[in-house]
Amino acid sequence: MRFFIDTANIEEIKEANDLGVICGVTTNPSLIAKEGRDFIEVVKEISEIVDGPISAEVISLEHKGMIEEAEKLSKIHKNIVIKIPMTAEGLKAVKVLSSKGIKTNVTLIFSAGQALLAARAGATYVSPFVGRLDDISQNGLDLIEEIVDIFSVNSIEAQIIVASVRNPIHVLQAARMGADIATVPLKVINQMIKHPLTDKGIDSFMKDWEGASLKL
């Protein structure tokens, strides 16, 4: 499993990139709006930090508008991936963009059927949302397992990005199932780094070292 960071905050992206664990970034209109900055400027700055796929989402809900926006965004940097909502209009846009060699990430997927259609339309990535399904008392990880199985059996090349990740369990279970990528907030990355026994071990080592009056 590979890791993307799910944010439009430049400082968070820099921090995660410095850890050496991420190889891409996903954004959405809500994350961009939260930063209160120009959309294009933010995407350009991200592309200067992370050398990997950067998902930037279209705003139009009509396929012709999606295609126009996608062509504009794709010119920002070679790593730009166009994020398209899972709708009939979105699928039309994905088909056209795929034929032009523009990579797409179909987002807001909540069923295996949606993932399969997106892949067949030509999506480079599909993004099923785990946490939001959990929020309505469904098991989001069940969806990941189902999509992984379907894609494997049918030799589908579209990559699965596990999205709406709320905790390390989402990441680890999805990794065990064989999902390609998890896009996670910095908070979850930090939760995965920490373990109380690691902290305890470091404290013990330092006390022993200082007690022996040793120098490196």
Swiss-Prot record:
User: What is one cellular component GO term in this UniProt entry?
Assistant: cytoplasm
Q: Which InterPro entries match?
A: Aldolase_TIM, TAL/FSA, Transaldolase_3B, Transaldolase_3B/F6P_aldolase, Transaldolase_AS, TSA/FSA_arc/bac
Q: Name one Pfam family in it.
A: TAL_FSA
GO terms for biological process?
carbohydrate metabolic process; pentose-phosphate shunt
GO-annotated molecular function: aldehyde-lyase activity; transaldolase activity
The active site of this protein is located at: K83 (schiff-base intermediate with substrate)
Q: Which residues cross the membrane?
A: none
The pathway noted for it is: Carbohydrate degradation; pentose phosphate pathway; D-glyceraldehyde 3-phosphate and beta-D-fructose 6-phosphate from D-ribose 5-phosphate and D-xylulose 5-phosphate (non-oxidative stage): step 2/3
Keyword annotations for this protein, in alphabetical order, are: Cytoplasm, Pentose shunt, Schiff base, Transferase
Q: What is its main location?
A: cytoplasm
What is the E.C. number?
Answer: 2.2.1.2
* Cellular location(s): Cytoplasm
Protein family: Belongs to the transaldolase family. Type 3B subfamily.
- NCBIfam families according to UniProt: fsa_talC_mipB (TIGR00875)
Name listed for the protein in its UniProt record: Probable transaldolase
